[in-house]
Regions:
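Sec-dependent N-terminal signal peptides
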Residues: 5-14
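Alpha-helical solenoid repeat scaffolds, predominantly canonical TPR units
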Residues: 37, 53-63
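N-terminal secretory signal peptides that target proteins for export/translocation
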Residues: 1-2
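Short amphipathic alpha-helical segments and their helix-coil junctions
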Residues: 19-29, 117-126
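Compact alpha-helical subdomains of small soluble proteins
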Residues: 64-150
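Immediate post-signal-peptide N-terminus of mature secreted/exported proteins
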Residues: 22-52
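Short, solvent-exposed secondary-structure capping/transition elements
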Residues: 46-55, 69-73
């Protein structure tokens, strides 16, 4: 039983590379991981894959929380922040708590991801077309490769 717990703990640590990130650049890259995961989560919601939506959201949330903690602890150089963090995300990192900031980031990432899905010209797309467009965007963005596998 003890061996199984130790093995599980070791596998968990090895499967969580972001928790061991120590360089400024690695922390900054987490902002891009969070943004991409939030975009992909929004797309998965459109084609009704709730497990994938949740997996991506939780990964984005974890990466975002780690990124914000590192940013607040001044562990990220300005150079890395400028080169790795999505510019819009950088504008949204204000607010009373990290969760509030991540809520703003999620909303903006969702809007960016769904812009080509929800409307064509000035009219709303029907549900079946939205699902198809969301699936196409999801595949084009290689969303399945983001975060730990299902």
């Amino acid at each position: 039983m003890i061996k199984r717990l130790i093995l599980t703990a070791v596998l968990f640590v090895l499967s969580e590379p972001s928790s061991m990130a120590q360089s400024s650049r690695e922390y900054a890259v987490m902002s891009r991981s969070a943004w991409s995961a939030f975009e992909c989560s929004a797309l998965a919601a459109q084609f009704k894959d709730t497990k994938e939506q949740e997996r991506l959201f939780l990964y984005g949330y974890k990466e975002g929380k780690t990124f914000i903690a590192a940013l607040q602890a001044r562990k990220i150089d300005q150079r890395d922040l400028s080169s790795e963090t999505p510019w819009l995300m950088g504008l949204l990192l204000e607010g009373p708590t990290p969760d509030f900031m991540l809520g703003r980031v999620y909303e903006a990432a969702q809007e960016a991801a769904l812009k080509p899905v929800l409307k064509t010209a000035d009219s709303l797309n029907p549900d079946d077309l939205r699902r198809t467009l969301a699936q196409n965007e999801y595949n084009k963005m290689n969303c399945r490769l983001i975060g730990p596998p299902k």
